[in-house]
């Protein structure tokens, strides 16, 4: 199982442009959560190779702001495997485009389940 966890780790990089900002001119939290859910979904699907559905999120923390002119790397890794639910840890790392500063800006857990054709949970 450890090998599957390693192989399913997913990384996606985004540039922070004006269209992703909020009224305070930092990364909009809703945009960040959309990116997190997408990477979590890809991670869960790569791990299980089944149709996965987001069940819930847990403990999303906005640790530091992300400014325009930065990169955001979204990293997903399987954290816990249950009989029907899968927990994916997501971190967003902010990185200067033209410098060396890099820091963890946002983190959270996304919980997924695989559902059958009747939308009932099925074993992973």
What are the roles of these predicted feature ranges?
Residues 1-53, 113-124:
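Hot-dog-fold acyl-thioester-processing enzymes
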Residues 49-65:
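Small beta-barrel nucleic-acid-binding modules, principally OB-folds
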Residues 15, 19-20, 59, 66, ...:
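Generic hydrophobic-segment detector
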Residues 3-12, 67-68, 79-124:
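HotDog/MaoC-like acyl-thioester-processing domains
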Residues 52-54, 70, 105:
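Generic preference for hydrophobic/aromatic residues in regular secondary structure cores
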